[in-house]
Amino acid sequence: MGNIFSVANFKEPTTVEDCDSTWNTDSGGEEEQQEAEEEEESEGTEQREDDNEEEVIKQEETNEGGEEETGTETLIAEVKAVIHNPEQGDSSTVEQNIKPKRSFYAARDLYKYRHQYPQNIKDLRSPNDLCNLRFYMNKIPFKPDGVNIEEILNKWKGDYEKLEHNHTYIQWLFPLREQGLNFYAKELTSYEIEEFKKTKEAVKRFIVAYKMMLDFFGIELSDKNGNVSRAPNCQERFQHLNESQHNYLRITRILKSLGELGYENFKPPLVKLFLQESIVANTIPNMKQSALEYFVYTIKDRRQRRKLLRFACYHYEPPEHFIWGPPDKQKADENKATKKTTTPSSQKKHSHVEKKSRPAKSIKAPESPAVQHDEEKGTETMQTAEIHRQATAEVISVNETEVCDDGTVTSENNSSKTGQTEACDDGTVTAEDSSSKAEETDSGNSETRSLDTEHDLKRPEADRETCCKENIVVVEYTEKESKDCLCSLSPGTSNSNVTELKVEGSETGPFT
């Protein structure tokens, strides 16, 4: 029942990122990276020592044979080297410039394999005839060739031509829970896998078949733990493996079958050897893409996959074309870089806004001009003309007015912007100034008295009352038709010095 529910809850992946969960739980990544670097350093030192020994031997050989060579032969060799090197350099640069791409088909296929084929309903319904187990028990031959397992293991070993050109035996030697090119081969079932692991005879023959295919690839099994190494004929077999790329599909099948039949620990050493030969030693350069795209992702343990990918990333050339790395860390580094570049500009923008907003707060309203008295008598008429042009109806809103019985109006300024007026019975308006900024001087001097509202507010109320009584201005109505002169001003005190009132505002018609 559990398998049925897993099939119902399974969601088909739609992207490569959905299929690849290698870097999702990268716990202990730093420790793994340190271990990988230590292994790489040790391997690098060993390779350098071997290279140094080879160089010393070559130098000795060239020194011994250099006396026999003539000058013309050396010139010809140098010319040939100059001719061939540019072509090799161009081809290598062209190959390096091609950036690889992830295959969604490969990622989805290996995702299903690592998750034990969640949509494989056939595994639940198919009859358990155990064809693969009976073949390994040497009870039935494989179809369609009709050859038993013992004949394959004994007579086909070392026959590289037969192993290369026959395409029907590999599905029987390394069965999977998926259909292959040989439609006569039966798919594995979960029940058959359990029975296969329990049968020692079948497991023994399975290991022998694995050794036979390793020999075909130029590799040999070193121990029972699955460690592998180069075979004596590795140079010839690696060259053949580099040219016959259809064998990469066989390697992928072998790796999958190892995991199905209980030999998951055999896969990392074999994959690492292929990465070593294809990326580092460059003996099988055509295998590079398949090793990174297929072989690595047959391993079910994420930690093992990360180790192998770090090893490959360390040696991959050019490094910017390595697309199997941790995407989360790359994005985090990019985000950090973008944050460092964006924060100064944003701070500048905020400071610029603050600089612009500060002057707006410091703007003050213009102060109302005070009444000024000209010392020269000839300028009195000019001052009165300016007063007439600038007088407005705000006198009513700024000053307090009193309407008397005789029609005159007396206005009193109360040092506030919204003054009040009192209308008299006679129709005149009396305005009383209480917000003047006048500073009293000596009684003998003829200087002007300024009407400053701020200075007047600081005075006590008693002083303001006396000042207002001395500076009463009576506005009289003169002519109805006159628009230029709104009113005539007459001093309210007996003093010979005339106090003039200048009101700032918009122009209005005469009082009625």
UniProtKB/Swiss-Prot annotation:
| Pfam families in UniProt | OGFr_N
**Where are stretches of biased composition, namely Polar residues?**
408-421, 490-499
**InterPro entries, per this entry?**
OGF_rcpt, OGFr
Output compositional bias ranges, type Basic residues.
347-361
Name this polypeptide is given: Opioid growth factor receptor-like protein 1
Q: Where is the composition biased (Acidic residues)?
A: 28-54, 62-71
Regarding protein family, the annotation reads: Belongs to the opioid growth factor receptor family.
> Where along the chain is composition biased (Basic and acidic residues)?
328-337, 449-468
Q: Name one GO cellular component term.
A: membrane
State one molecular function term (GO): opioid growth factor receptor activity
List all membrane-crossing ranges. none
Region Disordered, annotated ranges: 1-72, 323-469, 488-512
